[in-house]
Amino acid sequence: MNNKKNIFDIVMYIIFGVLSLFLVAKTDYGTGVLVFVAILYLAVIAYKIKQVFSNSDS
């Protein structure tokens, strides 16, 4: 059950990340902020995936 919740969290992070990237792209902040936000979300998603695999091992 816990594993399903983690996978759901990852999917929500991906949807939220894509939505925020779209909204940031619509504004005039420039590519620097866009790249920063993209790296931030990739780091969060990678951390969540790592958590899922460490939980499934134990």
UniProtKB/Swiss-Prot annotation:
It is found in: Cell membrane. Keywords: Cell membrane, Membrane, Transmembrane, Transmembrane helix. It is a multi-pass membrane protein. GO terms for cellular component: plasma membrane. It comes from the Bacteria. The chain crosses the membrane at residues 7-27, 29-49. This is Uncharacterized membrane protein YdzM/YouB. It comes from Bacillus subtilis (strain 168). The lineage of its organism: Bacteria, Bacillati, Bacillota, Bacilli, Bacillales.
